[in-house]
């Protein structure tokens, strides 16, 4: 996959790839206020516990923590953990809702990117990993590090 020079990763959810098997990915817009955009551009967002829910034919992102903007007054600042509307096509919402309801999967945000001036969320349709799967991933990562270390020493 070619790297697009117009796309810049602002916030990454590295924990999601460790705790879940990502089956599919989608890109969605997010309905944000001005102070939220400023905080995200400064990298002051946390995707750790965030997830998507589907209600009334709309997709909502819950538990996305965006810190209040430093220079804005408290009157104009936003609620850090309010739910935010995800902007997806109707077919995408219906497909994601079907996967979540039937197969017991979940939708988690993987990262927030700046794409041509717009903040987008990369969402992953995910299945939770079991404890032994997580241990296996740690073992594989350690063996890869050891192999790289050996190759570097040569």
UniProtKB/Swiss-Prot annotation:
This protein's UniProt keywords: Cytoplasm, RNA-binding
Function: Required for rescue of stalled ribosomes mediated by trans-translation. Binds to transfer-messenger RNA (tmRNA), required for stable association of tmRNA with ribosomes. tmRNA and SmpB together mimic tRNA shape, replacing the anticodon stem-loop with SmpB. tmRNA is encoded by the ssrA gene; the 2 termini fold to resemble tRNA(Ala) and it encodes a 'tag peptide', a short internal open reading frame. During trans-translation Ala-aminoacylated tmRNA acts like a tRNA, entering the A-site of stalled ribosomes, displacing the stalled mRNA.
Organism of provenance: Synechococcus sp. (strain JA-2-3B'a(2-13))
Protein name: SsrA-binding protein
Localization per record: Cytoplasm
InterPro entries membership: SmpB, SsrA-bd_prot, SsrA-bd_prot_CS
Chain positions covered by the region annotation Disordered: 134-154
GO BP terms in the entry: trans-translation
GO CC, one annotated term: cytosol
């Amino acid at each position: 996959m070619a790297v697009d020079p117009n796309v810049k990763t602002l916030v990454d959810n590295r924990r999601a790839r460790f705790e879940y098997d990502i089956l599919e990915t989608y890109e969605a817009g997010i309905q944000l206020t001005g102070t939220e955009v400023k905080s995200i551009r400064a990298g002051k967002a946390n995707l750790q516990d965030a997830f998507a829910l589907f209600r009334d034919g709309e997709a909502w992102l819950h538990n996305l923590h965006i810190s209040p903007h430093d220079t804005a007054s408290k009157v104009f600042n936003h609620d850090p953990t309010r739910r935010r509307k995800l902007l997806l096509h109707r077919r995408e919402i219906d497909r994601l809702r079907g996967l979540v309801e039937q197969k017991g999967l979940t939708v988690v945000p993987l990262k927030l990117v700046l794409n041509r001036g717009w903040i987008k969320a990369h969402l992953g349709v995910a299945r939770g990993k079991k404890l032994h799967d997580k241990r296996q991933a740690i073992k594989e990562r350690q063996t890869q590090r050891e192999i790289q270390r050996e190759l570097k020493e040569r």
